[in-house]
Amino acid sequence: MSWIDKIFSKSPISSSRKANVPEGVWTKCTSCEQVLYRDELKRHLEVCPKCGHHMRIDARERLLALLDKDGVTELAADLEPKDILKFRDLKKYKDRLTAAQKDTGEKDALVVLSGTLYGLPIVAAASNFGFMGGSMGSVVGAKFVAAAEEAMEKNCPFVCFSASGGARMQEALFSLMQMAKTSAVLAKMKEKGVPFISVLTDPTLGGVSASFAMLGDINIAEPKALIGFAGPRVIEQTVREKLPEGFQRAEFLLEHGAIDMIVKRSDMRDTLASLLTKLMNKPSPFNAEELSDTE
């Protein structure tokens, strides 16, 4: 027992009431460290109402907040990863998969839904960073291709939200092959004139940033998202120089022309609807009066 525990154990002061607060009611902003009511944070789509910091959000939750409520269907839901290489690092790959599936409730790191956005048919995908860092393996690549092919078949836009540390090392070349596979299907979409919008969220790194995440007809980022190939610490250790302030953050990339827009999560739905209706040459879902109110 420490000295401070001994002092408090002898203290005559005791509470007649026990704290009866369930776990998970409160959480803390990862930026400003403000204590937040969990339900309030969820209503703000995991954006801190105090400082505006965009925290990571569950992939399925993100997509359901984007799409209209009716007519949502999941694509390639039956695909599940396999440990073809019998890979083992500190743990077996199959054990890592089991743990990630239990923690997230998903079979792999990409969720693909088909639905509408203000009545406009779209296909939308989102990475789940909670599933092995959103890493891209064979199933993620296959789901991405399935989403792109569905968009081409329906002649509707495809939107993908990336949040990934890169290629999944446990699948070795099977993972790296997905970079070429996803890039190839996007080239096919481009030939057919089907729009693809890439939304880069925190973080988008490695093989994902080096493939489909930067191949959008329009590339959007959330505020302060970390975007790049290697992380800033790795680069600093390699070049042995101090990087510029904000290097690899969304604002730095926008200033240097690497992305097209930065959009807050609260504005994402309306912004995507406006962009997609223009790309598809469809009537805007907003009338002139509504647009003037938002400007």
UniProtKB/Swiss-Prot annotation:
Q: What is the lineage of its organism?
A: Bacteria, Pseudomonadati, Pseudomonadota, Gammaproteobacteria, Pasteurellales
Annotated organism of origin: Mannheimia succiniciproducens (strain KCTC 0769BP / MBEL55E)
- Matching InterPro entries, A to Z? AcCoA_carboxyl_beta, Acetyl_CoA_COase_Trfase_b_su, ClpP/crotonase-like_dom_sf, COA_CT_N, Znf-ACC
Please list the residue ranges annotated as the CoA carboxyltransferase N-terminal domain.
Answer: 25-294
The yes or no answer to whether the keyword Mitochondrion is present is: no
Query: Which of UniProt's keywords are assigned here?
Result: ATP-binding, Cytoplasm, Fatty acid biosynthesis, Fatty acid metabolism, Lipid biosynthesis, Lipid metabolism, Metal-binding, Nucleotide-binding, Transferase, Zinc, Zinc-finger
NCBIfam families per the UniProt record, alphabetical: accD
Q: Which GO terms describe its biological process?
A: fatty acid biosynthetic process; malonyl-CoA biosynthetic process
Q: What does the UniProt function comment say about this protein? A: Component of the acetyl coenzyme A carboxylase (ACC) complex. Biotin carboxylase (BC) catalyzes the carboxylation of biotin on its carrier protein (BCCP) and then the CO(2) group is transferred by the transcarboxylase to acetyl-CoA to form malonyl-CoA.
A Gene Ontology molecular function term of the record: carboxyl- or carbamoyltransferase activity
Q: Which domain of life is it from?
A: Bacteria
- Output this protein's name: Acetyl-coenzyme A carboxylase carboxyl transferase subunit beta
Q: Name one GO cellular component term.
A: acetate CoA-transferase complex
Assembly? Acetyl-CoA carboxylase is a heterohexamer composed of biotin carboxyl carrier protein (AccB), biotin carboxylase (AccC) and two subunits each of ACCase subunit alpha (AccA) and ACCase subunit beta (AccD).
HAMAP family assigned: AcetylCoA_CT_beta
Gene (name only): accD
